[in-house]
Amino acid sequence: MSAFTPASEVLLRHSDDFEQSRILFAGDLQDDLPARLDTAASRAHTQQFQHWQVLSRQMGDNARFSLVATADDVADCDTLIYYWPKNKPEAQFQLMNLLSLLPVGTDIFVVGENRSGVRSAEQMLADYAPLNKVDSARRCGLYFGRLEKQPVFDADKFWGEYSVDGLTVKTLPGVFSRDGLDVGSQLLLSTLTPHTKGKVLDVGCGAGVLSVAFARHSPKIRLTLCDVSAPAVEASRATLAANGVEGEVFASNVFSEVKGRFDMIISNPPFHDGMQTSLDAAQTLIRGAVRHLNSGGELRIVANAFLPYPDVLDETFGFHEVIAQTGRFKVYRAIMTRQAKKG
């Protein structure tokens, strides 16, 4: 996270304007500009655990990770720099949360890639902080306004839910497959054997649908779920509770906070990080799985058929199987044997 994103490069064109400002950085913080920009004071709030990991090393307690920002997170700030995410409901949640806490008169900057839909910030904030475009470069837009009225923020109003085969799935903005079960997860679910036992880890759990569906036909499994996203962690907890399923849920950057070994690791790993395609998480998942599987345990993942996972699976486990596939997706299985590299 040393190279700056295009959005940060646009902000750097205005770095002189920020030297006397007490800035809160928030939104899609994909680099460490919040820790490096010359300001009077800097804070950062993120819903992404992996971004908090990087920023907290340099900013300490001034970098915060949570679903909802609190008054302490924005204390003494007179400027908000908000990085627009690719997901508009996510931006709505975060901006309404932050603007409900910041004092009237706060300088508001919104920056983002044009293809992410950053233009819609003008309409979203029209009643609270009317924005004007002040720069356009690197296929990004930078908008500025001043907070004129605090919105009323109620996190409960952002919850959604849907049903899958009689199961209730709770969701929040920014959670993968917020509006329904994706095709890849459906394919992975179709391969899970009823009456499975043992410890199961769901990495990148999203709204928790894989785990609750698995637990319904295999009630003796012991579930652990993790995700980098604070909305996903909270959504998974709510999904488990809504279906009467027990499990431990926590934030983790793939295996960073995971302890112990499991009989099965399941995942529909992400390959988009913000607006960029990224295979890092899935490759970290495959290579790290051998340190968290019991002997004879298995890794089972679903992925777009075009992604180059077979080589990483073979390199790590010695072999792999494709146990289900469609034109777009494949479900891979790899077993922890003596052939597997022990990490």
Swiss-Prot record:
Principal location class: cytoplasm
Reaction(s) this enzyme catalyzes, per UniProt: guanosine(1207) in 16S rRNA + S-adenosyl-L-methionine = N(2)-methylguanosine(1207) in 16S rRNA + S-adenosyl-L-homocysteine + H(+)
CDD domains: AdoMet_MTases
Pfam families assigned to the protein according to its UniProt record, in alphabetical order: MTS, MTS_N
Keyword set, alphabetical order: Cytoplasm, Methyltransferase, rRNA processing, S-adenosyl-L-methionine, Transferase
Coiled coil regions, renumbered to chain: none
Subunit structure: Monomer.
UniProt cross-references to PANTHER family, sorted A to Z: RIBOSOMAL RNA SMALL SUBUNIT METHYLTRANSFERASE C
Protein name per UniProt: Ribosomal RNA small subunit methyltransferase C
